C-alpha cells in the first residue's frame, strides 16, 4: 500500500466491499458506533506499532500466523465483538494488508450515513480549542452539514491554513502566498 494513503483500484475495491459489508452488518445489529470505536482503537495500535504494521503488510506470514497474532492483540487491547471478528476474518482471508483502507472506508460510510462531511485542515502550529471550534463552525456554515475535522500540523506552511473538503481545496497558507510573490517578482525582471 502506498505510504501517502492513496490506493490502487484493486485495494480500493477490496476495502470498499469489505467496509460496506461490515457497515451493513453493524447497521442491522445496531452496532455501527461500537464497531467504529473498536476499529479506531485498532487503527491507533496500527499507527503506533512498527511490528503490527509489518505483520499487516508482510506476505511472509501465513493466514494462521496473522490470525493468531491479531487475535492475541485484540484480546489484550479489549477489542471484541463484530469489529474483532471482522479483523480476524480479514486475516483468515489474507486481506489484512487492506485493513487500513477498510477502516477508512468504514469511517467514510458512517460519516455519509450520518450526513457528516470530512474536512482535512492543515495549519502551521497547533491552534487553541477555541480556534478549532471557530474553524469547525465556519466549515459547518459553508457545508451546511456537520463536520468531522481532521487536523494536521504542518510547520512548512509557515502560517495560515489549508482546507480540503471533498473535491474542494482552499490554500490560504503563508508559504503559498510567499511563493506567489516570488514568482511575480521573477516575472517582473
UniProtKB/Swiss-Prot annotation:
GO terms for molecular function: proton-transporting ATP synthase activity, rotational mechanism. It comes from the Bacteria. It is found in: Cell inner membrane. Keywords: ATP synthesis, Cell inner membrane, Cell membrane, CF(1), Hydrogen ion transport, Ion transport, Membrane, Transport. It is a peripheral membrane protein. It holds the Pfam family OSCP. GO terms for cellular component: plasma membrane; proton-transporting ATP synthase complex. The keyword Kinase does not apply. F(1)F(0) ATP synthase produces ATP from ADP in the presence of a proton or sodium gradient. F-type ATPases consist of two structural domains, F(1) containing the extramembraneous catalytic core and F(0) containing the membrane proton channel, linked together by a central stalk and a peripheral stalk. During catalysis, ATP synthesis in the catalytic domain of F(1) is coupled via a rotary mechanism of the central stalk subunits to proton translocation. F-type ATPases have 2 components, F(1) - the catalytic core - and F(0) - the membrane proton channel. F(1) has five subunits: alpha(3), beta(3), gamma(1), delta(1), epsilon(1). F(0) has three main subunits: a(1), b(2) and c(10-14). The alpha and beta chains form an alternating ring which encloses part of the gamma chain. F(1) is attached to F(0) by a central stalk formed by the gamma and epsilon chains, while a peripheral stalk is formed by the delta and b chains. Belongs to the ATPase delta chain family. PANTHER family: ATP SYNTHASE DELTA CHAIN. This is ATP synthase subunit delta. It comes from Methylorubrum extorquens (strain PA1) (Methylobacterium extorquens).
Amino acid at each position: 500500500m502506498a505510504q501517502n494513503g492513496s490506493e490502487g483500484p484493486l485495494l480500493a475495491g477490496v476495502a470498499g466491499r469489505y467496509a460496506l459489508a461490515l457497515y451493513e452488518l453493524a447497521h442491522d445489529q445496531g452496532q455501527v458506533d461500537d464497531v467504529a470505536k473498536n476499529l479506531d482503537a485498532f487503527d491507533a495500535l496500527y499507527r503506533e506499532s512498527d511490528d503490527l504494521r509489518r505483520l499487516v503488510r508482510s506476505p511472509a506470514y501465513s493466514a494462521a500466523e496473522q490470525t493468531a497474532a491479531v487475535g492475541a492483540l485484540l484480546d489484550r487491547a479489549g477489542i471484541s465483538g463484530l469489529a474483532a471478528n471482522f479483523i480476524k476474518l480479514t486475516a483468515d482471508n489474507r486481506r489484512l494488508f487492506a485493513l487500513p483502507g477498510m477502516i477508512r472506508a468504514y469511517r467514510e460510510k458512517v460519516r455519509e450515513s450520518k450526513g457528516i462531511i470530512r474536512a482535512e485542515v492543515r495549519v502551521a502550529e497547533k491552534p487553541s480549542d477555541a480556534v478549532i471550534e471557530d474553524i469547525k463552525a465556519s466549515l459547518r456554515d459553508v457545508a451546511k452539514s456537520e463536520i468531522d475535522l481532521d487536523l494536521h500540523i504542518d510547520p512548512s506552511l509557515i502560517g495560515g491554513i489549508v482546507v480540503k473538503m471533498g473535491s474542494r481545496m482552499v490554500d490560504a497558507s503563508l508559504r503559498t502566498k510567499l511563493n506567489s510573490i516570488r514568482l511575480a517578482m521573477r516575472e517582473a525582471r
